[in-house]
């Protein structure tokens, strides 16, 4: 199986900066970051191997969730539309829903962001507060999804303010405080 690493810390502790650095969106002031033996910034394929949720994704608000995912999927020369339907169902969204994303609740947009992160079956998932805005049932469904991804040998890095999410899901937990990372 895979591994789930948890990241906790107060607002402003540096969690999002760390995630952006892991993703290669920010460069390190000193040293380097490697994930699965690949040095971030030097290996351009890293971003292609990761499913990422860092902040509110920039979905096209007048398009449906399905059409947003379809657009991103076809940009990558993927054509299996049935797969998109199954991904939406897996995160608890009705693929036939034609409502524009701008009319989605926060929880529905979060489910769509999770669908985007997992739709290409990446080996690595980098998830900043993936359960944000979800109701109790949604949290349960996404926890189950993440545990399935772990069983599929995925590497998951998960930040959460909800200690229960961390305790239920994570194999190892790290704390960010004042820009310093330490294992708990």
Per-segment meaning from a language model:
Residues 23:
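Helix-to-loop junction immediately C-terminal to a conserved catalytic motif
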Residues 31-46:
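Conserved ABC transporter NBD signature motif
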Residues 8-10:
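The feature captures the beta-strand-to-loop junction immediately N-terminal to the Walker
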Residues 70, 81-96:
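Conserved ABC ATPase "signature" region
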Residues 160-161:
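H-loop/switch region of ABC-family ATPase nucleotide-binding domains
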Residues 114:
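Hydrophobic anchor residue at the start of the ABC signature
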Residues 125-129:
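Catalytic Walker B motif of ABC-type/P-loop ATPase nucleotide-binding domains
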């Amino acid at each position: 199986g895979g591994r789930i690493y948890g990241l906790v810390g107060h607002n402003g502790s540096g969690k999002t900066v760390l995630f952006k650095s892991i993703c290669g969106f920010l460069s390190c002031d000193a040293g380097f970051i490697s994930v699965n033996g690949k040095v971030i910034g030097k290996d351009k394929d890293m971003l292609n191997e990761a499913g990422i949720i860092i902040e509110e994704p920039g979905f096209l608000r007048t398009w449906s969730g399905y059409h947003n995912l379809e657009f991103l999927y076809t940009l990558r020369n993927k054509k299996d539309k049935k797969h998109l339907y199954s991904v939406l169902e897996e995160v608890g969204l009705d693929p036939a829903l034609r409502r524009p994303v701008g009319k989605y609740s926060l929880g529905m947009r979060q489910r769509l962001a999770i669908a985007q992160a997992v739709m290409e079956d990446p080996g690595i998932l980098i998830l900043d507060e993936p359960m944000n805005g979800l109701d109790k049932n949604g949290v349960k469904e996404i926890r189950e999804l993440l545990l399935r991804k772990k069983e599929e040998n995925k590497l998951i890095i998960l930040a959460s303010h909800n200690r229960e999410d961390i305790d239920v899901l994570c194999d190892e937990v790290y704390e960010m405080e004042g820009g310093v990372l330490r294992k708990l």
